[in-house]
């Protein structure tokens, strides 16, 4: 398998280094092979060259079987530039529409939640990953004045919501789970409930 590796920023490279060690250990155990293709996307590259994601990056990442990404966000880069220019661009370019987040309490691990055991904390969050506030819609007017206004729009299409819901049901069936709980801020985001 060809895996494009993006260490990124902050603790990202450190986390990715540990993930690569784990993948290396799986090679012989499962008789599989990995070819790691290192990519320098992130804040350091942006500060040096002004590049976020180039067409060459898209081609290289698109030819991989998988992308391993650490973290994006650099203290010397204004918030939003890297996140929109790298994370959101990659999500949209490769249609990575599902954010899948398992939540598991492992045996022997303490939790601040009262009287909870591993059988109580074992669920998966399925979240739409390319729309909503991730659509990147919004802007400023009267920038730098006392009348400055900033907007951030949440764009949600029926098709994106439907495929996210379908994914959740398929995941539930495939993994022998029994329950789906839809979660939304309906009191604040009333129009999203139209779908």
Model-predicted regions and their roles:
Residues 2-11, 68-73, 180-185:
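Short glycine-rich or small-residue beta-strand-to-loop segments that form or flank ligand, phosphate
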Residues 9-12, 65, 126, 168:
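Buried hydrophobic positions in well-ordered alpha/beta secondary-structure cores of metabolic enzymes
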Residues 47-142, 146-151:
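N-terminal glycine-rich phosphate/adenylate-binding segment common to multiple enzyme folds
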Residues 1-36:
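N-terminal phosphate-binding or glycine-rich loops at protein starts, especially the Walker A/P-loop
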Residues 31-37, 175-183:
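Flexible, glycine/charged-enriched surface loops at secondary-structure junctions
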Residues 33-53:
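N-terminal beta-loop-helix "entrance" segment that forms/cooperates
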Residues 186-195:
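Conserved small/polar residues in nucleotide/adenosyl-binding loops
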Residues 165, 169-179:
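Glycine-rich phosphate/diphosphate-binding loops that line cofactor/substrate pockets in enzymes
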